[in-house]
């Protein structure tokens, strides 16, 4: 059966409403975002006297749950869309998508459609990795689709009457890339007539998660110093721009090479580095893609901005750079005491490749339970415990 026919569902703890979505990842193509289409099944008894709503919320969580107990709120809703699915409002009937038509045929008369179009200026899903002692929900940007019944969409409803699904807004690598990054520096040392030249480059502009990154290093050492150490690091830079100007830089890969470059000699070599979350699972605050199942998560993808987009509404911006550093010193026992560093930086774009387009099958849909997933180190909150009971 084609992958396009898989459908995810989540039922409220009271069993009265069930929300169905075709997927969990919605692609931001920079110019537009894939619509969020689904169906909600309502218990016939509730259709007689209850209103049923579906909302989609983009929220930014930047503090711990336990701080909210003393009256401090560390969650900000960036964007909220809502619709009343029952009873349907006049003039709001839309044509069903092919998948909604199949679900309607499968689920029957108690199923009602809903659809949301995301704004193009919303951030992508990003999760900040919790520390070993952290509890509650992880900080970051998330998207939630929520179905519930009540008298008004703004009404505070019991958690047992709500079906919640966390979805992701993701970006994939563009089909066309720019020039491969290149940087060079010339360093003049005291007591040396000629300089040391360091040149570094990548083979391409965009790299995929898990793919080895080739770093080409070229050294022209015309000095009387010896290059004793070559170190390549990959750094993740996370800008939290929504509520402050906080910036966090974390090393996600570090390789020290044993190669040396003698005085008055040249050196050229291509090195491989591969930044992986598997080697950084203990680093608190590391930005991850918004998948909330630890085994399925990776380092956050580089943020792609549309020209003219307001950065402040993006919540969290993620970028990467590669630093090539040389340690040059004189020979002898005391040479390292007066060593000098020479370094260059290269921008790195780290993303997922665009997957193959899914096909919509004429066969019956396959429905899969939508279980809430957690990061390693993240504990169940009260909502999850209530839903599990």
Curated annotation (Swiss-Prot):
Which Gene3D superfamilies has this protein been placed in? Answer: 2.60.40.640, 2.60.40.840
GO MF annotations, alphabetized: G protein-coupled receptor binding
Looking up SUPFAM superfamilies in the UniProt record yields: E set domains
* Annotated tissue distribution: Retina and pineal gland.
* SMART domains the record matches: Arrestin_C
One GO term (biological process): G protein-coupled receptor internalization
Q: Which UniProt keywords apply?
A: Sensory transduction, Vision
The answer to whether the entry has keyword S-adenosyl-L-methionine is no
The secretion signal range is none
Q: Which InterPro entries would you find in this protein's record?
A: Arrestin, Arrestin-like_C, Arrestin-like_N, Arrestin_C-like, Arrestin_CS, Arrestin_N, Ig_E-set
Which top-rank group of organisms is this from?
A: Eukaryota
Known function = May play a role in an as yet undefined retina-specific signal transduction. Could bind to photoactivated-phosphorylated red/green opsins.
- Return the similarity comment: Belongs to the arrestin family.
Output this protein's name. Answer: Arrestin-C
- Species the sequence originates in: Lithobates pipiens (Northern leopard frog)
Designated gene of the protein: arr3
